Amino acid sequence: MRNAWQWLVVFLGAVASAAAAPFMVVVYNVENLFDADGRAAFEDYQPARYSRAHVLTKLQNVATLLAQFEGGRGPDVILFQEFEADATPGATAPDCDAILRRYAGVRIEEMLGAKFDDAVADLPAEALLLKAMADRGMTGYRVIVGENITAAGTTRALAQTCVVFTRFPVKAVRSHPTVDARAILEVKVEVDGAPLYLFNNHWKSGASDPVTEAVRVENAKTLRQRLSEILRADPNADVILGGDFNSHHNHKRRNPAMAVTGVNDVLGSQGNELAVRGTQRDLYNLWFELPVEERGSDAYRGEWGTLMQMMVTRGLYDYRGVQYVDDSFGVAKVAGLNVDAKGLPRRWTFEGPAGGGFSDHFPVYAKFLTVPDNRTDRWVALRRASVESAEPAEGRKVDFAAVDLERVAVRAEQVPADTSLRSDAYRGKIVRVEGTVGPGRRLTVSFLGEVYDVWSFDEALRERLRERFKAGETVRFYGELGQFRDRWQFVIPDESWVK
């Protein structure tokens, strides 16, 4: 357990045995990376809101963040979620190497600008990102795209898919259809002659919903069945499971009313690092590498979540083939890039002529290496083996009181005359509000000539605000501007914002 970011910029020092250079695996939900063909299943990604300039911003931001790894070289393996399932696919899969050769003398800015044509419009999102990364010196990737297939019982078509970028030779690929979720992408690579299985997941959304948990149970069964097949053939097979599981690492503990959870009960994710040496548990969840106060890749209603996950099998702790580097797991939060003023993921926004932001999830990462010993009877010596400690059942609260409101807030005098806050330019901004409370049960405030709802995801705080804010009175607070069901609102996440 250590500074979560240091592994990205400091070369790994002492390692357990003579081995090949450590390599990095990153898991990253990019929050809807769509291409530039002007066709999309989501309304927000139609040309009216998602122009070529937006595509370019999205690509450049993803590439910029990935360039923070390995001294600008980028990770050797990336498990991506939320790439657009190409709405205009060709008869054959695109040849990404050929695409890079074709556009070797053209930068991505030109491809989406003055040199944009039908051929560029026809390129899928993964090819565009590959080019944006190549322009920054991140090269040598093989690209594997999950098939847009689902299992029987799926209720609707899906617009996203999972994608893997890897520098290692690819030996086998399978897409496993599952109910109401993106196909689970299995990629078998070879690292210094050793086989390594990668499983890229994006399970059904709605982490706290018991109805959708039943679907995630089915997603877990799909993955568990294939994992069990591999481990029956070789109990010490090297397998990395990654992705957006739309479940927390301690999902069972956080949702005690759920009789069966997909990630813990069916898949078998758990936090006892030594247990995988035995025969009863074959998966270890890397979130347990971090102290409780550092666990969080995303946030919902003021609580940190751990939807982005990486799990490893027992084989990654032995001395054959690929080996996990102890305590190397972390969360990629880069100040000034993908972290907002509240310390949360700086999510994508359509605001302005070119959009901005990164994703509503922080990426997670871990280091691995290969060992030549070929011994499955010897285990990595752990500095401090993790256990499933008594973690609080509720999610860890976001520390909104720590936000420097004076520094980040938009003030009334900064808003140009005759300009409405009700626009993408101000959506998501923290605003210093001084206004008049409106009448009625719904708490509202009149500010700069317009009426806004005042809301908090903390129910107790909402009630206190209703008692404290009386109709006709002047109130002062900081609120995050947003929109819910076509109503504009200021969200007050913490009582310390009322001042």
Spans of model-derived segments:
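Metal-dependent phosphoester-hydrolase catalytic domains
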Residues: S175, V179, E229-A237, S247-Q414, ...
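A long, amphipathic alpha-helix that forms part
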Residues: T212-P235
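Catalytic metal-binding/acid-base residues of hydrolase active sites
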Residues: E31, F83-E84, H202-K204, F245-H248, ...
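Conserved beta strand-loop-helix elements of the APE1-like EEP
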Residues: L128-R136, G153-A172, G302-G321, K367-L369
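N-terminal, active-site-proximal structural segment of metallo-dependent hydrolase catalytic domains
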Residues: A18-A159, K342, E351, L369-A401, ...
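OB-fold single-stranded nucleic acid-binding module
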Residues: E273, A385-K499
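Structural recognition of the beta-strand scaffold that forms the well-ordered cores
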Residues: M24-V27, D76-Q81, R142-I144, C162-T166, ...
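Beta-strand-turn-beta hairpins that frame and shape the catalytic cleft
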Residues: A20-V25, F34, F168-A172, A181-S205
